A protein has these predicted regions:
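Conserved N-terminal segment of class I S-adenosyl-L-methionine
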Residues: 1-121, 125, 129, 142, ...
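Short conserved AdoMet
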Residues: 74, 136, 150
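A short His-aromatic
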Residues: 130-134
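A short glycine-rich, Lys/Arg-flanked "PGG" loop and its adjoining helix->strand segment in the class I
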Residues: 139-151
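Short, glycine-/aromatic-enriched active-site segment of Class I SAM-dependent methyltransferases
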Residues: 158-180
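A C-terminal cap/extension of S-adenosyl-L-methionine-dependent methyltransferases
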Residues: 170, 202-267
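Short alpha-helix
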Residues: 181-197
Length: 267
């Protein structure tokens, strides 16, 4: 799988300082929750086809540190949820969020590339948010991710679009964060899945704009940086308001904050 550009120590230094995120709530229709609502719509499309018996319908989140999504997948789709992460701090925080939401789930402390054998070829669904783009060999990382899927299982890979405007801003405002990513466009992400032996069902840019994906922790320490951060968030919110009044703002290579890939394991 190769080495990650982002170390465990880097992530834990961030997580110790930040408040736990609230669990994802698709019933909050406020504008600040717009990106969650977009992802909720995506997942309802992807998982609507799930027709397995309840005792076989399970989901694994890769890189589940302080996951706000595990309770969502349990409550909204009835998945038996499991998470895996290599950070003790991140795993403990994920367990805390599950407990706060009253959701049963398993969180395993392990590296994705050397996971316990009982987790392999086990899951009907696998998801990851911002994981595979940290590895130089994307196809090898995806091959390790796909090893958790049962034959016929579905995997959803979400990464930030570091090839577009968001990536350029991150490079300018926080080069040290940008350098932790391998910039991948939709074509490269699709190809990496195919090389990893997965069948791609869809691979595309997702959401028109969301500057909230930027990591601006360093510049927020200054008044100017805080002002810029708030201005960028206001611009994002303005585009979401336009979309709510039926102005069509399609996802695209330049402005979209995410690239998503939905794939399946055929054998």
């Amino acid at each position: 799988m190769g080495d990650s550009r982002a170390s465990k120590e880097y992530w834990e230094s961030l997580w110790r300082e930040e408040k736990l995120p609230p669990a994802v709530n698709p019933r909050d229709h406020s504008l600040k929750n717009e990106v969650v609502l977009k992802f909720d719509s995506l997942f309802r499309q992807v998982f609507a086809a799930e027709r397995r018996p309840p005792d076989e319908t399970n989901l694994l989140e890769l890189g589940c540190a302080r996951s706000a999504w595990l309770p969502y997948f349990s409550k909204e789709f009835g998945f038996c949820v499991t998470g895996i992460d290599y950070s003790p701090v991140g795993c403990d925080q994920a367990r805390t969020i599950l407990a706060m939401e009253g959701v049963e789930g398993n969180v395993t402390l392990a590296d994705i590339s050397s996971a316990p054998q009982h987790l392999l070829n086990r899951f009907s669904s696998v998801v990851s948010f911002g994981v595979v783009e940290h590895f130089e060999a994307t196809d090898e990382a995806l091959r390790s991710c796909g090893a958790f899927l049962k034959p016929g299982g579905t995997m959803v890979t979400v990464i930030p679009n570091m090839n577009g405007f968001v990536g350029r801003l991150q490079k300018w405002l926080g080069r040290e964060v940008y350098d932790l990513h391998v910039p991948l466009d939709a074509k490269a992400l699709r190809r990496a899945h195919e090389v990893a032996g997965l069948e791609v069902l869809r691979c595309e840019y997702f959401c028109f704009l969301n500057f909230g994906v930027l990591n601006l922790n360093r510049i927020r320490q200054s008044f100017l940086g805080l002002w810029l951060s708030r201005a960028l968030n206001a611009i994002s919110a303005a585009t979401w308001m336009l979309e709510r009044i039926r102005v069509r703002l399609p996802a695209n290579r330049m402005t979209s904050p995410y690239v998503i890939c939905v794939s399946t394991k055929t054998t």
